Amino acid sequence: SSNVTISWCEFLPASEDSVFFDTMMNAMKENPDNYPYYNHLLDAGMTDQQIYNYAYGQKKTHLLGQSDTDTSAKNITVTLANNYYKDSMDRMPRLRFGTAHVYNCIMDAQDLRNMRLDIQNTVGSAFSQKIVSNGASSNCGAHMLLENCYMSGMTNALISGNGDSEAGYINAFNTMYLLDGKE
């Protein structure tokens, strides 16, 4: 595909009315034997609220290009404009091959970072490390330009290459980056 535009969207964690998360938490409390990881988190010292927060963030947002070896996306051209990302852990976006222009976007993961730090201070880094903190990622020779964006709360705001993925090209202009309220 080419000339794909995703604009004026909000990408938010959980459900707005929290019905899904309340149902999930109630099911775990009522049937703890069916949820060993939940029990493990409690045994490690996490509170129900911390577990709720642990599950709250959106893990992955945009992936463009399905794998490092499938080059079918090499001609993709995408524009992400005027979008709002709240408490996403990764892929705002992640691009393999192709070209992306990201502008006038707000990527705010500070609340999620605060949750991660709270969990780390309570039960250690083994659990908090599962809350990743990545922003935009360019891989496999992709080209990405970010302009006039606001990025907050991400340890790795801009990434070229990710894991075993080859590097791509990524550049940001007029983009503000804050971590814990500091530029």
Name every feature range the model reports, one short phrase each.
Residues S1-K182:
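Glycine- and acidic/polar-rich repeat regions and solenoidal domains
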